């Protein structure tokens, strides 16, 4: 063990290995089998998942992935690799003995394999950074579960720090604000990934984090309350999710006099299917068809310099 080497585990959701129906089916099965994501009784849910949902959804989702797939593969994985390399370069420039690895909750590279690589490299401490600014049991807690599984075969558990959230971090807020330039009469919509409403009532304070992030960015931009709003996207199933829903809101706004909209997905650290297809394409079409005149998607922070610096400072505070 190198007593001076620090390991950093960047963690995100994950992606299929390729945009094919079998690969997407494997990915969705792993993702939707996580009780942190779907907490229905296991036997009942597995029957529904395997015999009703996966056969129907896998081909449709694979088609959507093919539309955004790049030469580097999945946008989420490609951008996450860029983030990993940019952070590694940052610590190298600072002459800090830090090794940055990337792991995904679902798919490859797994969090368990990334944890194993860090331990085999002889790190004396691991800093786990889930790339979810707003805490949720459905995302952040799943990272902790996977990290713990990665430690199960280790005789000696190295000390670790777990970054719970950074929804109100000043550098993260500034990085978001730096990407936003509103035109005249343009309204700003913060679209966060939704969770079932029931999860909030059971103690998940994700929506409070989302509201706080949006408020801080709006304050940084000196926006009035009439210039921005928060909605929630990507709902799944019949259960009520956090509202207002992004898609329904965008379809109603033109009739309410909002003709120009800018949409930012502040909870996504990297662009992915939910931003590139659902928000940048599908919801744009819906808004314009409903009478909107201008729709602008503001890309995720991805590997831009402000974002990397914000993440680096979060990590440095734990070294």
Swiss-Prot record:
Keyword Ribonucleoprotein assigned: no
Keyword Lyase belongs to the record: yes
Family matches, as Pfam families: Ferrochelatase (PF00762)
Enzyme Commission (EC) number: 4.98.1.1
Residues engaged in binding Fe cation: 193, 274
Cellular component, GO, one term: cytoplasm
PROSITE patterns attached to this UniProt entry: FERROCHELATASE
GO molecular function per UniProt: ferrochelatase activity; metal ion binding
Keyword set, alphabetical order: Cytoplasm, Heme biosynthesis, Iron, Lyase, Metal-binding, Porphyrin biosynthesis
Protein's pathway: Porphyrin-containing compound metabolism; protoheme biosynthesis; protoheme from protoporphyrin-IX: step 1/1
Location in the cell: Cytoplasm
Catalysed reactions listed for this entry: heme b + 2 H(+) = protoporphyrin IX + Fe(2+)
Principal location: cytoplasm
Example of a GO biological process term: heme biosynthetic process
HAMAP family referenced in this protein's UniProt entry, alphabetically: Ferrochelatase (MF_00323)
PANTHER family per UniProt: FERROCHELATASE, FERROCHELATASE, MITOCHONDRIAL
Family: Belongs to the ferrochelatase family.
Role played: Catalyzes the ferrous insertion into protoporphyrin IX.
Protein name, entry field: Ferrochelatase
Species of provenance: Actinobacillus pleuropneumoniae serotype 5b (strain L20)
